[in-house]
From Swiss-Prot:
Source organism (scientific name): Influenza A virus (strain A/Ann Arbor/6/1960 H2N2)
Annotated site, Essential for channel activity, possibly by being protonated during channel activation, and by forming the channel gate and the selective filter, chain positions: H37
Other comments on record: When the channel is activated, one or more imidazole moieties of His-37 probably become bi-protonated.
Regulation: The M2 protein from most influenza A strains is inhibited by amantadine and rimantadine, resulting in viral uncoating incapacity. Emergence of amantadine-resistant variants is usually rapid.
Residues with lipid group (S-palmitoyl cysteine): C50
Phylogenetic lineage: Viruses, Riboviria, Orthornavirae, Negarnaviricota, Polyploviricotina
InterPro entries, per database record: Flu_M2
Keyword Lipoprotein listed: yes
Task performed by this protein: Forms a proton-selective ion channel that is necessary for the efficient release of the viral genome during virus entry. After attaching to the cell surface, the virion enters the cell by endocytosis. Acidification of the endosome triggers M2 ion channel activity.
Domain comment, as recorded: Cytoplasmic tail plays an important role in virion assembly and morphogenesis.
GO biological process terms held by the UniProt record: protein complex oligomerization; symbiont genome entry into host cell via pore formation in plasma membrane; symbiont-mediated suppression of host autophagy
Self-association and partners: Homotetramer; composed of two disulfide-linked dimers held together by non-covalent interactions. May interact with matrix protein 1.
Record-given protein name: Matrix protein 2
Composition-biased stretches (Basic and acidic residues): 71-80
Any one GO CC term of the record: virion membrane
């Protein structure tokens, strides 16, 4: 029996499914794939920003500091922190020289 033509019918005062092939491996595989698809769809819609940012930028956190002297790195960190600390509004304006 096809899944599209499956009908629930009242059987002895209960609702039951009149299909005998529910143990068919194809039906089991389709059910597992459907459940996995639903779980992945929900996770994608909950965490899409994190997921796509990870795939786009990898594990990097900010600009590369490779080849930059430690003093300049520390100065940049201080500027970033002071810009965040000094501003109470939602927008921060940072001018780079």
């Amino acid at each position: 029996m096809s899944l599209l033509t499956e009908v629930e019918t009242p059987i002895r005062n209960e609702w039951g499914c009149r299909c005998n092939d529910s143990s068919d491996p194809l039906v089991v595989a389709a059910s597992i794939i459907g459940i996995l698809h639903l779980i992945l769809w929900i996770l994608d819609h909950l965490f899409f920003k994190c997921i796509y940012r990870f795939f786009k930028h990898g594990l990097k956190r900010g600009p590369s500091t490779e080849g930059v002297p430690e003093s300049m790195r520390e100065e940049y960190r201080k500027e970033q922190q002071s810009a965040v600390d000094a501003d109470d509004s939602h927008f921060v304006s940072i001018e780079l020289e």
